[in-house]
């Protein structure tokens, strides 16, 4: 059976949802929540599910983090001798959080449906200046879905007349039948130290070959030496890969059982100030990154 696509109405009447599916695999992407991947089943195995009763505006579930990942302390930064003040959307910590795409409405601009895969292209064009980020850009998200994998390619085009700073990331939450007995494996020798407001203070050495989740409450950021992260659960093994050479991994356990956020990023919190992972995009220049999820075995 070839992949199919349909638009459905969300349980909340204002949600615009695109569903891509065949007999064993499905994905639901919410157009007006930043074209975020809210549900994903690969080969009958649920990997990403609704986080109810947690709210999207609190979880940023599967949103693309752009033009900055995680936080900007007090919403203040300087770039090329100009000082900027962004909106504060994490009020209790007085930070700007997770960029500007999470609540934007994307459009479907192309789709290719085949027997073995579906490719859907979503686009958002920012034509107005944002407080603290007076630049324009075009974003395309290309979701490629197969029975045992999902690829997400992000293309950013600077449409403004000036160079802008950026980092980029992705914020998916994965479900496990038993998170206590699930494990994370990745190559890292350094992690970020945070203050009480989750702003980096520095780094410390990290020498564990894997993390057994158990009852750990995690909100950690790791410098990755390779672009591969393995998530092993009792029912599936997942590989998360990034095309970026300089990668970081934010790991977060939300206040919901058997769920964990694994966030691949190109920078760390407060990167607009500490410059760790910070990049620049010149006028008419493009940046592209690909993240891929692959089930390598399942029961």
Regions found by a protein language model. Give the residues of each.
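Short, acidic/polar linear motifs in exposed loop/turn regions
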Residues: 160-161, 297
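Acidic-aromatic substrate-binding/catalytic surfaces of carbohydrate-active enzymes
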Residues: 26-83
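Short Pro-Gly-centered flexible turn/kink motifs
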Residues: 77-85, 280-296
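Extended, loop-rich substrate-binding clefts of extracytoplasmic carbohydrate-active enzymes
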Residues: 1-8, 12, 89-146
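Short, well-ordered beta-strand segments enriched in hydrophobic/aromatic residues
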Residues: 18-20, 27-29, 141-143, 150-158
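Active-site/ligand-binding surface loops and adjacent short beta/alpha elements
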Residues: 84-86, 91, 162-165, 172-243
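Acidic/His-leaning functional-site neighborhoods
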Residues: 25, 95-111, 201-203, 209-277, ...
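Generic N-terminal segment detector
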Residues: 1-47, 277, 297-298
């Amino acid at each position: 059976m070839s992949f199919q696509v349909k638009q459905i109405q969300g349980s909340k009447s204002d949600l615009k949802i695109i569903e891509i599916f065949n007999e064993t695999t499905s994905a639901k992407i919410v157009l007006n929540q930043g074209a975020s991947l809210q549900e994903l089943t690969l080969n009958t195995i649920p990997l990403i599910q609704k986080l109810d009763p947690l709210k999207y505006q609190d979880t940023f579930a599967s949103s693309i983090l752009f033009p900055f990942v995680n936080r900007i302390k007090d919403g203040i930064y300087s770039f090329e001798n100009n000082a900027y003040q962004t909106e504060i959307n994490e009020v209790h910590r007085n930070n700007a959080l997770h960029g500007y795409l999470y609540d934007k409405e994307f459009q479907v601009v192309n789709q290719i449906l085949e027997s073995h895969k579906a490719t859907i292209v979503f686009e958002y064009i920012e034509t107005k200046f944002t407080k603290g980020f007076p630049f324009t850009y075009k974003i395309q998200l290309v979701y490629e879905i197969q029975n045992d994998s999902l690829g997400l390619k992000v293309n950013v085009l600077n449409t403004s007349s000036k160079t802008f700073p950026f980092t980029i990331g992705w914020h998916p939450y994965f479900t496990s039948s038993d998170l206590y007995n699930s494990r994370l494996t990745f190559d890292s020798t350094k992690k970020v130290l945070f203050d009480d407001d989750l702003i980096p203070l520095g780094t410390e050495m990290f020498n564990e070959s894997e993390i057994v989740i158990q009852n750990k409450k995690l909100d950690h950021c790791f410098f990755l030496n390779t672009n591969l992260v393995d998530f092993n659960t009792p029912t599936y093994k997942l590989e998360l890969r990034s095309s970026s050479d300089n990668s970081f991994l934010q790991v977060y356990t939300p206040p919901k059982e058997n769920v964990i956020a694994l966030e691949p990023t190109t920078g760390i919190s407060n990167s607009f100030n500490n410059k760790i992972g910070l990049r620049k995009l010149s006028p008419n220049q493009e940046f592209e990154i690909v993240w891929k999820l692959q089930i390598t075995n399942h029961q």
